[in-house]
Every structure is written in structure tokens, then in C-alpha cells.
From Swiss-Prot:
Top-rank taxon, per record: Bacteria
Assembly behavior: Homodimer.
SUPFAM superfamilies: Pseudouridine synthase (SSF55120)
Protein name as it appears in the record: tRNA pseudouridine synthase A
Organism of provenance: Staphylococcus aureus (strain bovine RF122 / ET3-1)
Entries under HAMAP family matching the protein: TruA
Role description: Formation of pseudouridine at positions 38, 39 and 40 in the anticodon stem and loop of transfer RNAs.
Keywords tagged on the record: Isomerase, tRNA processing
GO terms, molecular function: RNA binding; tRNA pseudouridine(38-40) synthase activity
Reactions that this protein is recorded to catalyse: uridine(38/39/40) in tRNA = pseudouridine(38/39/40) in tRNA
One of the protein's GO biological processes: tRNA pseudouridine synthesis
Residue positions binding substrate: Y109
Protein family per UniProt: Belongs to the tRNA pseudouridine synthase TruA family.
NCBIfam families linked to this entry: hisT_truA
Amino acid sequence: MRILVEIAYQGNNFLGFQIQQNGRTVQQQFEKLLQRMHKRHVRIHPSSRTDRGVHAIQQYFHFDTELNIPMSQWQYAMNRTLPVDIYVNNVVTVDDDFHCRYDCVGKRYRYKVYQAQHRDPFQRGLKTFIPEPLDLDKMNRAAQQFIGTHDFTGFCSQKTEVESKVRTLYQSEIVKTDDGFDYIVTGSGFLYNMVRVLVAFLIEVGKGRHEVSDVPKLLESKNRKNVPFTAPAEGLYLEKIYLDENELLKDFGNDIKIHRKKSLQND
């Protein structure tokens, strides 16, 4: 039986989602829990692998089990054992051929920034602090330039190992908030550090160090040295996972292209 689990977590005290030899990760917490329940190792398969310090409002993983536990009890059994910075929101059965990575057709991230004269210790780890004034309208116009299908070689980590760095963005916008702004981006998939590099670039635009017209040229250059900065992890949230293409079409229109994964190239 294949089980799909929807979770949320606060990423400050995790070294990321993916299990590591030394260090606390989200995957480690769940596989340790499932091993106690099954008396054997049970591997989980996530929809996305967030980095150290990145939060998730909605994340999914699946696993296979032979345990005869009522579906209504899975959520309770997990939450009573998990640490306080992880919570299971829902547990359902899925078809045996369902795969969290392959069946994911889109993801939405939100990056939160607050602006003030000084740091707020209560925002630590939850939002990124920027003291300088920013031109949010100009940043939003630059953000819109990323919508569509592009090669994001120049806007991801140089450690990115996947062969194709072409991704499709359905949404890319700056939204003003009471204390700063959020950057909201939805796409077919994301490269390593791609969202944080996009944010860092848009902040440079807001400071007047880049122009809106620079975006096409930087995409064309495919040179990360032209976009050298990466925003901190602390303001980044994995906000939504699209497992249903109809939901993606409803949010962004029937004329968008749906990308189904043939390999694990997309983050």
C-alpha cells in the first residue's frame, strides 16, 4: 500500500530535507519514526528537497507500507512522535504507480523580506532583513521578465548537475507587505538555489544596480558570474506543491504548458 503524506516544517533547525550522514534533517526524522513502526528501514520519497534553513508550508512525500493501520490513525501516530518543528497535515492512500516527484507538475515558493532601521530578533530565521530602500515597482517589472520558458543557467548554483537548465515559470511577482515585500514564484520546477539567486538579483534591481532591461541579456548570457549573489535561506518557503495538473491550469490558464518529469532533473 502506498501512502501520501502532506507535511509542514520550520526549517531553522534542519540541515535540509534530504538525509545526511551527520546532522538533523526532515527525512531523517520520518525514516526514524517509520523504522520504529515497521521494524525495518522504510524510505520516503519527497516532492521537493529543501535546503538548510528553508521552510515548507506544504510538502509531500510517499512511502510503501504493509502495516494494517486505519488511515485515520496515521496522522495521529506520526504527530505524537514528531518534534514540534514538523507537523503532518494529512495522510491518504494513493495508487501504487503514483510518485511524489514524477507526478509533481509545479511548485510555488515565497520569499519573505522585511525592511526596517534595525534587525528584529523576532523575525530571525523567518524573514530576511534589508535596511536599504528598494524600488518595488521596478523589481516587480523585472520579476515579470522571468515568466515563460527560459534557460536559467545564469540564475542557479554552479553546483547544479542536471543536464537541462530550462524551466518554465508561470508566476513571478513582487508583492508589497506591511513591513517589506514577498517574492512569489511558481514554476514547473526549480534548479539548485534558483529562487534565492532570482531574489538576490531582484534586490539588486531594487537598489538600482541592475535595470529591468538587463534580464533578457542575463538569461541569454547563461553566465552565473554576471549574477553573483545568493539570498539567504531564512526567508524562503516552499508554499505549494501541485500534484494535479487541473489545479495548475485553474490557477494559470488552460494555455500553459504542463511539464511532466521523465527523470529527477527538477528540484
